[in-house]
Amino acid sequence: MEQLHMYWKNEGQTVPEYKLPEGYTVKKITEVPDGVEQWLEIISHGLVDGVRDKAFYQRVMVEEKGFDPEYCFLVMCGDEAVATLDILLYTWRNDGHLHMVGCKENHRGKGLATALNLLALKTIQELGFATASLTTDDQRIPAIKSYYKVGFQPDLSTQDYVERWAKINAIIGR
């Protein structure tokens, strides 16, 4: 099944500053000595199935159009990376695309994804992009709630999308 799409328009609105719970910080993957290894561990918690290695990181990140490691963020709890979000810079369409957003199970429900989403929108706005976009799966209800919370809107461009979003919105009471 094709992933769902969501969009955010940069209309000069104020994007709130992100706030992390006490004990958490954000670093760029380039600032963490074993950042790639820690990123691989995070994404194994619900984003991908099976063992992943540096070749996987190379394929889904480094070789991805618009990838810049300066925009790959890790939420740290001490020396442990517990959540991640990457912004792909789609300059050809004036868009910042949220990519590989994930969090370890034992750190979910603490607002880390919302903080990362706000950081991404603020960054995208500061870079001057007109829009932000993302793709997600129907069953990722907590993630979808977080995307709605920061202002993303669903793509309703096809009847299939309309029907799928109606089911999701019924589940979350929207």
Predicted region positions:
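Conserved GNAT acetyl-CoA-binding A-motif
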Residues: 124-136
